[in-house]
Amino acid sequence: MMRSVAWAALSWRVFWLSLLWTAVSAKQDKPKIDSVMLEHPPLNLNYFEDSDVIVFQDIEERNIYRSEDAGFTWNKVKELPDGGSAFLYLHPFESSTAFVLTKDRKHYKTEDRGKSWTEFDSGSMPSAFQPDTLIFHAGDPKRIIFNGMNCDGIFCDEETTYTLDGFKTIQPLRPSTSGCWWAKSNTEFTTGDEDLDKTRILCIVTDPLSIFKTSQKLCVSDTFFKKENNGKYQEFEPTLDSNRDVTGVVSLAAVKSFILVASSSANSDEMALYVTSNANQWHRAMFPSDDSHDHSHQINQEAYTVLESTNYSIQIDVMTSHPSRPMGVIFTSNSNGTYFTENIPYTNRNIKGHVDFEKISGIQGIFLVNTVENGKDVDEGSAEKVVVTQITFDDGRTFEPVKAGDQRIHLHSMTQINNIGRIFSSPAPGLVMGNGNTGKSLGKFDDSNLYVSDDAGVTWKQALEGPHKYEFGDSGTILVAVRDSAKEDVDKVSYSLNYGDTWESVPLPKDLKIRPALLTTTQDSTSLKFLLIGEHDKRYHMVALDFEALEKSTCGDKDMESWNARVDDKGQATCIMGRKQTYKRRTKKADCFIKSNFKDPEPINEPCDCTDADFECDYNFQRDPEDRTVCKRVGSIPMPQGACKDKDDKFKGSSGWRMIPGNQCKRTKGAQKDDEVERKCSEGGGGNSGGDGSSPSVPANGEISHKKNDFDSEALDMQKYYLIRGDSSSGTDETIIARPIGERTGNSVQVENKVWLTSDHGKSWKRILDQEDIMKIFHHDYFKDVMFFSTKTDKILYTIDRGQTFHSFKTPVASDDFTLSFHPDKKDWLIWVGKHCDDVSGSKSCFPAASISTDRGDHWKTLVRYATKCEFTGNSAYKYRPLTQIVCLVHQEENLESPKTIVTINDFLADDKLIHNGTVASFATMNEFILATDEVTEAGKEKAGLQAIASLDGQHFEAAQFPYNFHDSHSSLYTVLDSSNHAVNLFVATDLSDGRRRGSIIKSNSNGTTYVLSASNVNSDEAGYVDFEKVAGLEGVTLINVVANPDKKDGKKEIQTKISHNDGAEWDFLPPPSKDVDGKAYKCSSAGDSKCALHLHHYTERDNKRRTFSASKAIGLIFGVGNVGSTLGEMKDADTFMSADGGINWKNVKKGAWTWQYGDQGSIIVLAERATHGNGAKTKTVSYSLDEGETWNEYEFTDKEVTILDLTSVKTGAARNFLVWCRSDSKQLFSVNIDFTGLTDKACEYKDDASASDYELWSPKHPLQKNDCFFGHVAKYLRKKKDRKCFNKATLSLLHGYENCECTRRDFECAYNYELDNHGQCSLVPGFQPLSGEEWCKQNPNETTWFEPTGYRRLPLTTCKDGVELDKTSDEHACEGYEDEFKRKHRTSGWVIFFAVVIPIGLAAAIGWYVWRNWSGKFGQIRLGDNSSTFDSDQPWIKYPVIAISAVAAVAAAMPLVIISLWRSATGVYERVSNRSRGGNWSRRYTTRDSFARSDYSMVDDDEGELLGEESDEEV
C-alpha cells in the first residue's frame, strides 16, 4: 500500500525539483531519475501499447495502480472497487482496452488506457480450470470468449459465454466444455474465409457419460453452437487424424498461423499433437524416426515446449532425458506444421520446461541456443552438464560458436532468466546483449559479465563487469543496464549511447540502494523512458528514468546508415534465409536520438536466387556425417494415399531435401533440389499414420503366417509382460518382456535369471539385462509402457520407452520386497517404503520409513518415519483432494509397539499432516475411495473389533452403513470387487469353512454412503478370490457363480452361474443353447432356470488369473468353459461356449476346454487346446474364426504335436498377432507368432450409407426389455460386418453414439435396507421398518426434504430421463426448519452437500486393494488388523480378518467403454491464484455435483504379469 506520507513527500519533491529544473536544464547531462516507494510488489506490470501509460496489480491489496508518465507518478484506480481486483488483462488487439476481473460476475473494462472504467456482467465467475479466462478475437476486438464457471456452493460447473460487442451483451455457448477458443486467436491465422474467420469457434467438449479427460473431444462451430429443435448443437467434430477418431483432447494452443491440439490416452503419457493452418484440414505432427539417434523423439506430457515460432513453421523442444537432468531436442516443422525435422539435440532445459533458446528479434533465421556438450554422458547419469552456447544464421540448419574476438563466450539464457521480456534482443535492429563468460563452457551466473553485439550476434564484446539486467531504448541508441545482485547494494544505473562501446552511470535518487527485481520499457523498445523496480528493506521502489532530459537532437538522414543483417568478409550484404535484409539505424557516433516513439523498425528485403544453403534434410533424412552434402534416409518416406498396392511398385517421394521453412529465395529454372524422385515401395511408410499400429508394412498376400522362436532355457514355462500402448502413441511396436519360470512352491516360483524382449510380438527376440541379477519385474501401475526390475541389491532398473533403453536408481533404504508406489498422473513420482536401520554403539535398531522422489529415483527425501505403507491419493481426476496428497499407515508415537493410524500428508511436507483420531489396522485405495478399518470397542465387550471407515477427501473418515442385521450373519472377511461403475461392490464372507466358502455381494450407492444386498451365496475360495467378473466394455454386465446348496454343511458345493444386465440389481441364469457343436440336443432345455442353464467355470478355478471372459475392444463377445445342466460339472467334462451379444444368447463352439484370445476388435478369434492339470492335450493347430464364431478354421503352426502352455495377445483384443507358448516332447520351450495381418491390408471404413459401410451399428440389450435401452440410453457400437475383408484400425473408437431413454424398472435397484423378494420386487429386510420422515431428517441433519420410501433407488450408471421414476413418489416433504426453503422449490445448497457428503462420508467396509506387496509377494491380499512385527511377513493370513481382491481381471475388463480412461490432464484449482501470475486467493472447489457424487472412477488394470499374473509377484 502506498502510504499518504510517501505521496506527500513525493508531491513536495516534485515541486522542488520543478524549480530546480528551470535553473539547471541547460546543463543537464544525465537522464532524469526519480523513485516511488510501494509496500507490496507490483505484479502483472504492463505498458499500454504505444503509450507511456503503465498499470500494475497489487496482489495483496487486490487493487490496480496506474501511471501516465512512464512510472514517475502513480495513482490507485479509484473507479474499481477497493480490494476487488483479481485479474488484470490488457487486450492484445486493441491497445487502449483492458479488463479487470473480480472473483464474481461483475467485472470492469477501460477503453481509454485506464482513465475511465465501466462495469459489465459476464454471467459467470472466471474459470478456475482454464489458463486464460478471456479469449480475444484477433480480427474483431469486440468479440471475446469468457471461460467461466458457475459456483452456487462448493461445486463449480464450467460454462462458457461470448460477446460480440465488448460485453455490452453476452450469450451462452455450448455446455459441457473444457475451454473454448476463436479460430482466429492470432492475427497471422486465417481459415481462408473472411466469414469463417469471424465466427469459427473451437471447444474441447466433455462426454456427458464420462468425466475423464480421455473422453474429451474437439468440436467446431460456425454458428456459436446454436441449438437445433432436436436438441443437438450445430457443430462438427473435425478429422484430426485420418486413421482414427481422436478423443482425449486435453489442450489447444494458437501459435502464430497454426493451431495445435494435444491429446492423451490411458496407459501412457505419450501425447499426440495435431496441427492445422486453416482450422479445416488437420494433421498429426510427425516426428522423425529415432532409430539412428542416441535419444528418443517421443512427445510426452510435461516434456515438450512449443518455442517461439514463425508464420511459416513451428519449433518444438522435446525433452528426451531424465527429468532431473533435463535436456531436449529442437524440431522444426515444414510449412503446414506436419513433418518435423531435428535441428539440434541435447538442448539445455530446466525442470520447469524452460529451454535455452531465443530468436533474434526482427531478423529472420537467427537464434541462440545452449546445448549440453556431453549430453550422452549426462543422460547416462555419469557426468554433470557442460553447457555451451551456439548461434545459427539459417534457422537451425547449421550452428556456430559465439565469440568475442578469438575467445568463445557462453551466455545464460531462459533457464536462468533474471528479467521480464526477451532475454537477448529487442526490436532494436542488430542489438543483442547477454550475461556470460569466456572459456570452454558456461559458468556460474554470479561470475558472468555483460556482453553486447551490434551485428545480430556475429561478433561480441564485453560491456560491463558482472551480471546485469538490461534493456534497449530509442530503437537501440540507448542501452541501459543495472547490476544484478542478491543483496541490496545496487546504487546506480549504467547506460550507453553508442551501442555499448562506452558506458556512463547515473546514481539512484536519495542515496537509494536496492536489490534489482526487474528493468523494463515499452514493448517496441522505441521509448526514451525506462522503469526499474527494486527492493530495499522489504519495500519496493519504482525508479523511473527519462533520457529526454539529455535534450539530444532528433536524428536526421546524415545520422543514419544502412545496416545489413548479414555481411561477408568484405562487408558486403549476403543472403540469409533467401534474402538480403537491410535496416536503417543510427550511426554509432551520431549524437542524437531517433525519437520515433512507438514505431517499429521496418526492414528492406531483397530476394536471392536459391542455392544449396536454402535447403535442409527432409523428414526422416539426416546429414551424412562423412559427406555433409548428402541427406541419407533414416526412416520411412511418406508416400501418397493408395500407392504401393503391389510390393514391386514404386512411388514419387522426397528427394531427401526440403526448402528451409520460411526461406524466401527465388527459384531458378530447371530441376530443383527438393523435386520428388522415384522411390521403391520398401522405402515408403504410412506417412501421417497417427500411430495406428495396425497398418501392414508389406502388402497383404491373403495368408496367415507364423514364426517360431526357441528359448535357451530348461524352465517349465514363461512369464509374459505386455507393454500396453495408449491410443495417442506414435509407435507401432508390440512389445513383450518374458522370462523362464520353473516349479511353484506355495506362493513362490523358481525363475531363471534370463530376460527376453520382443518388439514385433514374438517374431524376433533378444536377450536383455544379461549382466543384471533380476529378481522381480513390475509394470508401473498407471503407465503401462514403463517397467521396473528389482535386483538383489538396492539397485532398481527401469525402462520408460518400451525396452529401447534402460536406466537405474538406488533405493533410499533396504526393503524385504518391491515396495514402490506410483502416482496416477506423474510418471516420475515414486514412494519407497523400507527399513531404516541405525547402529549406535553396537546396538542395531530398525524401523520402517517412507521416502519420496519426484525425479524417478534420482533424489530421495524422507517422507515419514515408522510408516508401513504409503500411497499417492492425489489424482487430477479427484477435485476434492490435492494432487500432492499422500496417505500413510504409521505407528503412533514413532514406536513399533504402538498401534497404527492413518496420516494424511499434503504437498509432500511431513509437517503439513493430518493424523486420524483412531487405531487403524490397514487401509487401501480403490478408485476415488480411501478405505480402512478402524479398531473399536463395542459396548459391553472388552475386545476391540474392526469398523469399516472410508473417505473421499483423505481427511475425513466415517463409518459405513450396512443393511440392517447384516453383520449378524456375515464375517469380517471382505473382498473388494470391481468398483468402476460409480459404486463399491463388496464381497462379505458368510461361510468360512473349508470347501464351503461363500458370501454376499453388497453394493454402495453412488457416493458410497450406504450398502444394499446385490447377490447372496456367491462362491469364493480359501485364498479370498470370488467368482465375480464384469464383462469388458459393456456397462453393468456381470457374471457370478453362486452356491446352490448353501444349507448343506457337508458335501461338495453345487455351483450355478448367473448374469446381471443391470449392474447387479437383478440376476438371471444363462440360457443354454439348444444343441451342441455337433448338432445334438442337450438333455435339458429352457430359457435358463435353476433346473437347466449354462454354467461356466469361473475365476476361482483359473490357473491363469489373467484370463477373462471378454476383452474391452471385442464388444459383446464372451467366451467360457462349462456345461449345460442344473449345476456346474467337472472341468474334464467341460466344453467351450461363446456369446456374441453380451451374454443373452450362447452357443457351443468346441468340445473340450479351450483357451481363447480376441484380435482385431473381435473380428479375429483364436482358440487353442491348452494343456491343464487334468488334460495333457497335445496339438499342432489352433482354431480361428473371422466371423464372430459362426465358422471355424484350423491353422497348423508346427509340424509336430506339442504341448500348448498358453495363448496370448494384446489384452484389449485389438492386435492381429498372437503368440502360442509351447513345450516340445524334448522339453524345449518355444513360442510361435501367428500373424493375421497378411489376410488384408485394407482398413475398414465407416460410412453413413449402411450398405456401403464396412460396419454395422450394434447395441447391447437387456433380455427383459423390448427396446435397446441399456442403463437409460441406447449405446451404438461399431462392429465390422462379418463378410468384409478389411481390418479394424487399432485406435478405432467403438462407441459411435448414444441416446437417452425414459426410465423403467431396469433403471432402479433396491434401496438401503430393502432386498429382492421371490417375486423380484424390493421388500424390506426382515426386522426393519421404514424410517419416518422425522427419523430420516434426524439421521440426515443436512437434508432439507424427504420422500416417502419406495424401496427403490436409481442405478448409479443409468442416464435415463423422466418416465417411471421408482425412487420418487408424488409426496415430497420438507424437513423441520426447512419449510421456507422447500417453498422456494428447494435449491440444494453446496454447503449442505458439503456437510452431508464430504465430511460424513460413510462408505464401504474394510476394503482391499488389488495387490498386497508386503507379504511374501502373495498376490491379491492385504492384511487388516495385523499387529505383528512390521517386517514379519510369514504369518498365515487366516489368523486375521483379511481383505482380498477377487477377479481383478474383471476390474480392468469391466470399465465401461465410454469411461475407459486412466490418464487425465491435470485440472487446476485455485490454491493460490498467484501461481497464474494474475494473483488472487481462492478457495478450492469441486468441479460439478455429478463429478462429486459419482466421482471419477479409474480403471484398475489387470495387465498381464502385473496385477493378475501372479508369477510377477512370486518369490524368487
From Swiss-Prot:
Residue numbers on the Lumenal membrane side: 27-1390, 1463-1516
Recorded coiled-coil stretches: none
Residues passing through the membrane, by range: 1391-1411, 1442-1462
Subcellular location field: Golgi apparatus, trans-Golgi network membrane; Prevacuolar compartment membrane
Glycosylation sites: 311, 336, 917, 1007, 1342
InterPro entries for this protein: Sortilin_C (IPR031777), Sortilin_N (IPR031778), VPS10 (IPR006581), VPS10-sortilin (IPR050310), WD40/YVTN_repeat-like_dom_sf (IPR015943)
Comp. bias (Basic and acidic residues): 671-682
Keywords, sorted A to Z: Glycoprotein, Golgi apparatus, Membrane, Protein transport, Receptor, Repeat, Signal, Transmembrane, Transmembrane helix, Transport
Membrane topology reported for the UniProt record: Multi-pass membrane protein
Top-rank taxon: Eukaryota
SMART domains the UniProt entry points to: VPS10
GO cellular component: cytosol; Golgi apparatus; membrane
Record field: compositional bias (Gly residues): 683-693
Membrane topology (Cytoplasmic): 1412-1441
Region annotation (Disordered) ranges: 642-709
Record bears the keyword Nucleotide-binding: no
Signal peptide region: 1-26
BNR repeats: from-to residues: 108-118, 390-400, 451-461, 495-504, 756-766, 798-807, 852-861, 1137-1147, 1184-1193
Family annotation (SUPFAM superfamilies): Oligoxyloglucan reducing end-specific cellobiohydrolase (SSF110296)
Gene Ontology biological process terms in this record: Golgi to endosome transport; Golgi to vacuole transport; protein targeting to vacuole
UniProt record similarity statement: Belongs to the VPS10-related sortilin family.
PANTHER family linked: SORTILIN RELATED (PTHR12106), SORTILIN-RELATED RECEPTOR (PTHR12106:SF27)
Function: Functions as a sorting receptor in the Golgi compartment required for the intracellular sorting and delivery of soluble vacuolar proteins, like carboxypeptidase Y (CPY) and proteinase A. Executes multiple rounds of sorting by cycling between the late Golgi and a prevacuolar endosome-like compartment.
Protein name, as recorded: Vacuolar protein sorting/targeting protein 10
